[in-house]
Every structure is written in structure tokens, then in C-alpha cells.
């Protein structure tokens, strides 16, 4: 043990730790989890934090705050790594390397519809639906681009099941040759299944297998004089070969992930290049939150690299064994490479190797990954230097003593008082934090009363923030002096004092650059020059709050109008309304539906069906 002053209780605990695999949680005096780790031998690993040799910056800072330690013994290292990954995601401890929440990374989902599966973008914290998932992808745009490619080549439907069931004729997707209209049985379940299987192989990077099968099918179609089907297959082959050329096929088979990591003061970047069947299928960047900002010792930089790699393994591979490749190539040696190989191989059900300093074609893959890593790091630094300079400009403008760590902005949206919604967006030193955005459905006020709407939203929000001890440094209101005064009264009544309250009024012309700023703390109003960095930051936050509010308002308004339209028809209550919408997918399709189709809806007799039909066809 070192000369740290350990409590008698903690010292005794360290002597009684088991020499088995498991995870450990280090807590401060308030019971907050500071760090979660895994170990093949809990006794050796946990005691190592308190040895004289462990002098790293991070370790010293961590150990100085430890009040107690909790452990969970597991049956294997694999189980320990899985449990560690899940706990880090759930608890987000201060001293762990934290990758962004899963919600931030979108997936492609193929549903498990028995006959005609649907392809869609999926991103949610909720329990995922059954079916096949592919990803994660670097962003929504990448997912949408891939889905469009799959629709063009394999013609997989992307419509909701409720819409699919209600179709009586093909939709626009069929007309533009992105769907085979399974809704009206223009394709058999057997042939559609072949297309789905090809799409899955495509997403797995198995293009050559698809090409071989398509060529064989085309040959059979020609021999059977089915020239129309042969032409379709020919076009699929042509499009797939074009994609192969774009992806850069190399003379090497097998699957690999190439992972290049760079650790900088304050952040780390992970570049993951996905190679499937010898093709560069994808390249994406991850920017985990690192547990401390200053790396003043080589040991700390190396240990953080190791921790970053292990965190990525837990985040990226352990949720689904299908993503684990034959080979993982890295740009730095791994301390526990054999242990990780064993864990990944067990999870996968077959061998997975980790390789450092590759040669030949594999070295070209690593060069590709490192080049992309450098570009990603440069873009990140450029973006965040801009954000940092804007934050500094706002700090100087507001004459604040401390740095701005967190800002929140509120906006109200409605259409002549209908379906009023308030939005709250959150920015920190990294920029927008979409996972912390909140929307508020405003009820019980006079329609169009923006003051009452703002009062209700801020009151609800700040009661939660006070309980969570997560108050912003700067509170921005998209509105004039009246709304800002209301908010000032609300936060004062809640006992909140140490917050800078700022109003952003649109000005008489409502043009960008002419905003009037209302600084409540100093009781002054002013306009900033158009090239002001502080103004650009405020405009960004204000525009994001407005976008989020108006999107939520439109959804609520559409839902309200659908409900009110149907409920105005005598005999249509909540259950029948839901049955109609489930059958037809929306008002537009219901309005187009013939009388005999409406009669088929459960709970709708002929008389009521006629009344509904006449409502849309007066």
C-alpha cells in the first residue's frame, strides 16, 4: 500500500477481495460512482490502484476521491466485460472513457415481417424491435444513402406496416422502381425473400456471393425465355459492380476491422474502417469523452489509449456478436490482447484475432484508417476551436468570472394558439446535446398566451433541474422583454440565483443579425455587430430551439387534427379511430378509400362506413 490515508473499513475490504474475475465500482463520499472497471483477478487489480508504483495523474485524482468500493464477481472475463460495458453506459462515470450514447448512432433495421420485411432507419433507447440490425453508422445521412441504394438494387419496401396493409394500388416507390409493390402482390413472398437475403448479404459486404447468384439466376431466366426478369437481374449486377468499383476491391478475402486511435489532451478519436470480403465497406469516427483534460505523463497517455480501446470494444462489439470480424487490426499494441481475443472469440462463437503493425494489403488498410483518423482529428479540432472561441466571446460579453459549461434555450411554437409546444435545447462545451433536449406539451392556458406557455415550461424544467443539481450557467429565452421578465420571476421564486438570464428578441425586421439582446442581470438591451462570435453562438442556439419547437408543434398539430377530424364523425370514438388509422395509415389514405374497403375495418358497419365515406366525399 502507498501512504494514502485509507479508512480502516476500506483497508480491510482490500485485504478480503476475491481473486476471481468480475467488475468493481469506485464511489465517492456521496455514493456517486466515479469509475467502473473489469478484472480477471479482482484482488490484484483493485489493490494495484493503491500501490506506490501507480503514480498516474488520473489514478491519483481518482484514488483521492474514493470512499468505498463495490464489486460483482462474474463467471468469466467475457461476462465481466459485458457487465462493465453495460454499467458504463448506464452510469456514465466521471473517470471512464465514455462513448456517445447508443441513441446517437443510427442503425439499419430489417423487420421480421413473415412475408415482406421492411427496411428502415432505427435509432432509439427503447427496447428494439425484432429483426436484423446493421450498424452503427456514422450518421443518419449514411443510413439513408445506404437504404436508397438497397431500394434501387433490391427493391425492399420502406413503408410502415399500417400503410402497407391499407394499399389497394402501388405507391410512388413502385413507379420510380424502388419497390416491387408487395402490398398488392406484384411479387411473390418467395421472390421477395430472395431480394431480402441479397440485401442482407450486401449489408454484410458479401457482394461477390450476390453477383455469382444473380449471374446464375439471370442465366436461368434467359434459358426460360423470361427476358424481363433477366433484364432486371442484369441491372442489379451492373449496379453492384459499380458499387464494388467505388469501394475499392483488393485481392484479399475475409473480414477485418481496422481501428486507429489518437489520444489528445482533452479528447480521443477512434477511426474504425470496416472491411468485408476484401472491400472497404465503411469508415466512421467516434469521439469519446475522456476522463481528464491534461496528459502530462507518457504513462497516462498509454493507459488512456488502452482504456479507450477497451471501451470501444465494449461499446461496439459486445451488443451483437454478428459485428465481430475475423481480424481486428490496431495502430498500437494492446496490453491485454490475448484476453480480449479470448473474450471476443467466445462471444462470436469462432476465432477473432487482434493484429498490430500489419504488412502487405493490410498495411494499406491501416494507412487508409490513419489518414482518415488525421482528417477526423483536424476537423474536430477546427470545429471545437470555433466553439471554444465563441464561448470565450460570450463569456467576455456577459462579463462572467467562470467559464460557461452549460446553456439552455427555450422557445414556444403554435399556430394561432393551436397545439402549443415549448422546446428546451441544451449546449455544453462540445456544442449541442440532442440527447438532453426536451419538449413540453402546454396545457391549461389561454390559446396564444406565450407568456403563460413560457412560464409553464420553465417551471416544469427547473423543478427537475434543481432536483438533479444540473442548472445551466446561461439561460436563453427566444423572446422579448415580457417573456424574459416572466422567466426571471419563475426562477427567482424557485430560489435560483446564480444564472445569467439572456433574452434574444428578433427585432423589427426579424432578420438575422438584427437581434436585440436583453441582459436581465444588468437591466440593459443592446445589438451586437453582425460578425460577433458571441452573436453567432446565440443565433445557433436560438435557431436550434426554434427548429426543435416547430418540429414538435407540427407533429402535435397533425395528430390533433387527425383525431378531431375523425371524432367529429358521429359514431367514431377512440377505438374506431385507432382501427381506421391502423388500417389506412392516415387521413389521406382513408379519404381515398372506397366504401367497400372502409366496411372491412373491424367495428365499422355499413351505415357507419357510408357516413365516414360521405364525410370525405360531400
Curated annotation (Swiss-Prot):
Pfam families: GIY-YIG, HHH_5, UVR, UvrC_RNaseH, UvrC_RNaseH_dom
SMART domains: GIYc, HhH1
Localisation per UniProt entry: Cytoplasm
Biological process according to GO: nucleotide-excision repair; SOS response
Function (record text): The UvrABC repair system catalyzes the recognition and processing of DNA lesions. UvrC both incises the 5' and 3' sides of the lesion. The N-terminal half is responsible for the 3' incision and the C-terminal half is responsible for the 5' incision.
Subunit and interaction comment: Interacts with UvrB in an incision complex.
Descriptive protein name: UvrABC system protein C
Originating species: Legionella pneumophila (strain Corby)
Gene that this sequence comes from: uvrC
Amino acid at each position: 500500500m502507498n501512504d494514502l490515508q485509507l479508512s480502516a473499513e476500506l483497508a480491510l475490504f482490500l485485504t478480503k477481495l476475491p481473486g476471481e474475475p468480475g467488475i468493481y465500482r469506485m464511489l465517492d463520499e456521496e455514493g456517486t460512482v466515479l469509475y467502473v472497471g473489469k478484472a480477471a483477478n479482482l484482488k490484484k487489480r483493485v489493490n494495484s490502484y493503491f500501490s506506490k508504483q501507480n503514480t498516474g495523474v488520473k489514478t491519483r485524482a481518482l484514488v483521492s476521491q474514493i470512499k468505498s468500493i463495490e464489486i460483482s464477481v462474474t463467471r468469466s472475463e467475457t461476462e465481466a466485460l459485458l457487465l462493465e460495458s453495460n454499467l458504463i453506459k448506464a452510469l456514465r462515470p466521471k473517470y471512464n472513457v465514455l462513448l456517445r450514447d447508443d441513441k446517437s448512432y443510427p442503425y439499419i433495421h430489417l423487420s421480421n415481417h413473415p412475408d415482406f420485411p421492411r427496411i428502415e432507419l432505427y435509432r432509439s433507447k427503447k427496447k428494439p424491435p425484432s429483426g436484423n440490425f446493421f450498424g452503427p453508422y456514422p450518421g443518419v445521412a449514411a443510413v439513408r444513402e445506404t437504404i436508397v441504394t438497397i431500394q434501387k438494387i433490391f427493391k425492399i419496401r420502406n413503408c410502415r406496416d399500417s400503410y402497407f396493409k391499407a394499399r389497394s394500388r402501388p405507391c410512388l416507390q413502385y413507379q420510380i422502381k424502388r419497390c416491387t409493390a408487395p402490398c398488392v402482390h406484384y411479387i411473390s413472398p418467395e421472390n421477395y425473400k430472395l431480394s431480402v437475403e441479397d440485401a442482407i448479404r450486401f449489408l454484410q459486404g458479401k457482394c461477390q456471393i450476390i453477383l455469382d447468384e444473380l449471374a446464375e439466376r439471370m442465366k436461368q431466366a434467359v434459358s426460360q425465355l423470361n427476358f424481363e426478369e433477366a433484364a432486371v437481374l442484369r441491372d442489379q449486377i451492373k449496379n453492384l459492380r459499380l458499387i464494388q468499383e467505388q469501394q475499392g476491391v483488393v485481392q484479399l478475402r475475409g473480414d477485418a476491422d481496422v481501428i486507429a486511435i489518437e489520444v489528445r489532451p482533452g479528447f480521443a478519436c477512434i477511426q474504425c474502417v470496416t472491411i468485408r470480403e476484401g472491400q472497404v465497406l465503411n469508415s466512421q469516427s467516434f469521439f469519446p469523452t475522456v476522463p481528464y483534460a491534461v496528459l502530462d505523463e507518457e504513462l497516462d497517455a498509454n493507459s488512456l489509449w488502452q482504456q479507450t480501446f477497451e471501451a470501444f470494444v465494449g461499446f461496439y462489439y459486445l451488443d451483437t456478436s454478428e459485428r465481430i470480424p475475423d481480424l481486428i487490426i490496431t495502430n498500437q499494441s494492446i496490453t491485454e490482447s490475448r484476453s480480449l481475443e479470448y473474450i471476443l472469440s467466445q462471444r462470436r462463437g469462432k476465432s477473432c484475432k487482434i493484429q498490430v503493425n500489419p504488412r502487405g494489403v493490410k498495411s494499406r488498410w491501416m494507412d487508409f484508417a490513419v489518414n482518415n483518423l488525421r482528417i477526423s482529428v483536424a476537423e474536430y479540432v477546427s470545429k471545437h476551436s470555433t466553439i471554444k472561441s465563441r464561448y470565450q466571446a460570450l463569456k467576455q460579453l456577459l462579463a462572467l468570472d467562470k467559464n460557461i459549461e452549460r446553456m439552455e434555450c427555450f422557445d414556444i411554437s403554435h399556430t394561432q394558439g393551436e397545439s402549443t409546444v415549448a422546446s428546451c435545447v441544451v449546449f455544453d462545451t462540445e456544442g449541442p446535446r440532442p440527447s438532453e433536449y426536451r419538449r413540453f406539451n402546454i396545457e391549461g392556458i389561454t390559446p396564444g398566451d406565450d407568456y403563460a406557455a413560457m412560464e409553464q415550461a420553465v417551471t416544469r424544467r427547473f423543478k427537475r433541474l434543481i432536483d438533479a443539481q444540473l442548472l445551466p450557467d446561461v439561460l436563453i429565452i427566444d423572446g422579448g422583454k415580457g417573456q424574459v421578465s416572466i422567466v426571471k420571476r419563475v426562477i427567482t421564486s424557485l430560489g435560483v440565483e446564480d444564472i445569467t438570464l439572456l433574452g434574444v428578441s428578433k427585432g423589427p425586421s426579424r432578420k438575422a443579425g438584427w437581434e436585440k439582446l436583453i441582459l436581465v442581470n444588468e437591466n440593459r438591451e443592446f445589438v451586437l455587430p453582425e460578425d460577433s462570435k458571441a452573436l453567432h453562438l446565440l443565433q445557433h442556439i436560438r435557431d436550434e430551439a426554434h427548429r426543435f419547437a416547430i418540429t414538435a408543434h407540427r407533429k402535435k398539430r397533425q395528430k390533433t387534427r387527425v383525431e378531431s377530424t375523425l371524432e367529429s364523425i358521429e359514431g367514431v370514438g377512440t377505438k374506431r379511430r385507432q382501427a381506421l388509422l391502423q388500417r389506412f395509415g392516415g387521413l389521406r389514405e382513408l379519404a381515398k378509400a372506397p366504401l367497400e374497403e372502409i366496411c372491412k375495418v373491424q367495428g365499422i358497419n355499413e351505415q357507419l362506413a357510408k357516413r365516414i365515406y360521405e364525410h370525405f366525399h360531400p
